[in-house]
From Swiss-Prot:
It catalyses: heme b + (2E,6E)-farnesyl diphosphate + H2O = Fe(II)-heme o + diphosphate. The keyword Iron-sulfur does not apply. The chain crosses the membrane at residues 109-129, 131-153, 174-194, 200-220, 226-246, 255-275, 298-317, 322-344, 356-376. Converts protoheme IX and farnesyl diphosphate to heme O. It comes from the Eukaryota. This is Protoheme IX farnesyltransferase, mitochondrial. Keywords: Heme biosynthesis, Membrane, Mitochondrion, Mitochondrion inner membrane, Transferase, Transit peptide, Transmembrane, Transmembrane helix. GO terms for biological process: heme biosynthetic process. It is found in: Mitochondrion inner membrane. Its EC number is 2.5.1.141. Belongs to the ubiA prenyltransferase (TC 3.D.4.8) family. The keyword Ion transport does not apply.
Amino acid sequence: MWRRSVVYRFSSRISVSSSLPNPRLIPWSRELCAVNSFSQPPVSTESTAKLGITGVRSDANRVFATATAAATATATTGEISSRVAALAGLGHHYARCYWELSKAKLSMLVVATSGTGYILGTGNAAISFPGLCYTCAGTMMIAASANSLNQIFEISNDSKMKRTMLRPLPSGRISVPHAVAWATIAGASGACLLASKTNMLAAGLASANLVLYAFVYTPLKQLHPINTWVGAVVGAIPPLLGWAAASGQISYNSMILPAALYFWQIPHFMALAHLCRNDYAAGGYKMLSLFDPSGKRIAAVALRNCFYMIPLGFIAYDWGLTSSWFCLESTLLTLAIAATAFSFYRDRTMHKARKMFHASLLFLPVFMSGLLLHRVSNDNQQQLVEEAGLTNSVSGEVKTQRRKKRVAQPPVAYASAAPFPFLPAPSFYSP
C-alpha cells in the first residue's frame, strides 16, 4: 500500500508537470498548451502519467520544426531580396552607362531644336502632339546612337583627357561590344520610328546626320581644324529634320533656324576650344585654337559669325515666318552675343572666353523661344500676303493713272509756262 501511494503521488506530479511545460525552458509552451487544450480531449490521469515525457518531446519537436521552417522562409526571403537588390544595382549601372554614352544633355538640346523645327513646320495654330512626340523620340534615339559611336571611336583619345577619362568606355565600366550593340539598336529604332510615324524625308535626314557625325566629323577632328564647320552642319540639320517631319518638305522658311544654329555654333565652339585647348592637345584633336596661340584668329572668326546672325530676324519677318517683333528681339539678342565676342577679341583671356561661352548658351533657347512666340500661322501669312498684294495693286493703279494723265496732256513749251506778263499759263498746267 505504501509503495502504491508513493507511485501514485509521483505519477500525479509527473502528469501535472508534463501537462504544463515550464515556460522558462520552452518559451512557446503557453501557446502550445493553449492550442492543445482546445484541440485535444481530456485524458485520464494514468495515461497522462505514462505519456507525459513523450508529450514534452513531441511538443519540443513541433516547436523546433516550426522554428526551422520560419528560419528557412526568412533565409529564402533574404536571398530573394538580395538578388532583387543585385539586379537593381546592375540595372542602375547600365542605365547610367547608357546615359553617359548618349551624352543625354547634349541629345536633349538636339531634341529641343528638332521640336522647334517641327512646331514651325506645322504652319498652323494646331500642333499634332503625337507627331511632335514621335519626332522628338526618334531624334533622341538617333542622337544617342551618334554620340555613342563617337565615344566608341575615341576611346584612346578620351582616356588622355581629364574631362573625358571617366566616361564609361575609357574607365572600363562597359565593354566595347556592349556599347556597339546599344548604339546600333538606338540608331535603328530611331530611324524606323521616324520612317513609320513621320515620313521618309525626316528619316533620311536623321540617318544622314548620324553618318555625317559619326563617320565624317569624328575622324576629321584628328585631321584638320575644318572639323568645327563640319560639326556646325551636323548641328544645323535637326531643326530641318523637325520641319520635314511636320510638313513633308523643305522650303525657304525652313532654313532660318538651321542658319542660326550654324552661325551660333562657331562662337560657341571657338570659346570652348580656347578654354580647353590643353585638353584638346592632350587628346590629339586638331582644333583651330591649337594653331592660334594668341587667340586673335578664333576671336575674329567668332565675331564675324555673330554679325552673320543679325539679318536673320529681318529675313524671318520678310518671309512671313514671324511677326515684326521678332526683328527687334533677334537683333538685340545677336548684338548682345556679338558684344561678348568683341570683348574677347579685344582682350583674349580665359575670363572673356568664358563670358562668350555663357552668352552662347543663353542665346539659343531665347532665340528659339522668340521664334515660337512670334511665329505666324499659314492663315495669317495668307492674310498678310493678300494685304500686301492689295496695297501693291492700289499703289500700282495710282501710278498707272498718273502715267496716263501725263501722257494725255499735250506738250507745253517752256516759254508758255514762264511768268510772262501777257501770256497766262495753260489751264491744264499745274506747277
